[in-house]
């Protein structure tokens, strides 16, 4: 699933469907860093979760991202492929087609430092959302994205909806 704008999918339903049809769950949690479903963090429900640190995300390193998994074999494979698939760290021997998806150390350090500040970033996102709700509730037919009672959303981007379109 893709968790959109800080909100999370109904993971119980999705996991039930995955079991029924023998599917693997891989979460795109790019917009849901810091969001929870029934007390469990986004990205932790399937075989793997992915997060982006692009410039417009709640935490940014200017680019790059993170893969999370509890599967040790998959974690090693991901690390191997994202570090150019070198079979020897000192020689230029590649046993598969790999890519250079490593964050440079400075960018990684920025991400780690911001991770410690994530609760404060999310608190501020909630304050902004509360402001918009206070100021825009009752204006025309504006309504806000609904968040399931089971979700603690990070409010990544305030989202409003309306039936009317201005041409």
Please state what every model-predicted region is.
Residues 1-2, 7-13, 20, 36, ...:
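PLP-dependent aminotransferase class I/II
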Residues 1-61, 66-68, 73:
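Active-site phosphate-binding strand-loop segment of PLP-dependent enzymes
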């Amino acid at each position: 699933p893709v968790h959109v704008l800080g909100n999370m999918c109904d993971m119980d339903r999705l996991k039930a469907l995955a079991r029924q049809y023998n599917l693997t769950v891989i979460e795109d949690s790019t917009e849901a860093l810091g969001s929870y479903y029934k007390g469990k963090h986004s990205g932790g429900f399937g075989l793997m979760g992915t997060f982006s640190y692009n410039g417009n995300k709640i935490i940014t390193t200017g680019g790059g991202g993170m893969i999370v998994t509890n599967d040790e074999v998959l974690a090693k494979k991901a690390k191997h492929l994202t570090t150019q698939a070198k079979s020897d760290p000192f020689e230029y021997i590649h046993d598969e087609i790999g890519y250079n998806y490593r964050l440079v150390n400075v960018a990684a350090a920025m991400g780690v430092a911001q991770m410690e500040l994530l609760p404060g970033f999310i608190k501020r996102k909630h304050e902004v959302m509360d402001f918009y709700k206070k100021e825009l509730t009752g204006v025309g037919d504006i309504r806000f994205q609904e968040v399931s009672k089971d979700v603690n959303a990070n409010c990544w981007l305030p989202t409003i909806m309306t039936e009317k379109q201005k041409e």
